[in-house]
Amino acid sequence: MLNRKNKENIISKINKITKSSLSILIVDPTGITSNQMNNLRKSSRKLNVNIKQVRNTLMRFAIVDTEFDCLEKYIKGSNLIAFSHSHPGSAARIFKNFTKENNKIKIKLAVFERKIITDSNIDYLANLPTHEESVINFINIIQEASIKKLIRILILINNNK
């Protein structure tokens, strides 16, 4: 049984994790085996995602005065909380891939930029491009625009002759 001091330590740790998070994903862990949970934790470490199972009351106290305080009324039942630190869609990607292999898990909702994202719209968060993907897309757009301009100039020169 947790005493008051232990609970306060848990709340402060979760609060620190929450404040450094870009997004939070809440999942119903019912039906996940311990081996599957270990695999989830391994894959989450690679993408800088913390996965925690915290008592609902302690989680409600931990999110007070953070950008995730809108979650308070949704923290009910059995929950697995995933905190994304480096990219807002990391946790969503991990669990979307996991649900393809395991139908037992259910993504409840996510929070990104103080907005609740329901399970039906989780793809929005999971498909957000990473920083590297955004840079590559931007470079490709610039290259395409440059090539199109060069072709137009060559056509104009050819037409003027």
From Swiss-Prot:
Q: What SUPFAM superfamilies does the record tag this protein with? A: Ribosomal protein L10-like (SSF160369)
Q: What does this protein do?
A: Forms part of the ribosomal stalk, playing a central role in the interaction of the ribosome with GTP-bound translation factors.
Top-level taxon of the source organism = Bacteria
* Family to which the UniProt record says this protein belongs: Belongs to the universal ribosomal protein uL10 family.
Record-given protein name = Large ribosomal subunit protein uL10
Checking Gene3D superfamilies in the record gives:
3.30.70.1730
The record's annotation in CDD domains points to: Ribosomal_L10
* GO annotation, biological process: translation
Give the range the annotation lists for the signal sequence: none
Species source reads: Wigglesworthia glossinidia brevipalpis
Q: Please list the GO terms describing molecular function.
A: large ribosomal subunit rRNA binding
What keywords were assigned to this record?
Answer: Ribonucleoprotein, Ribosomal protein, RNA-binding, rRNA-binding
Q: Any one cellular component term from GO for this entry?
A: ribonucleoprotein complex
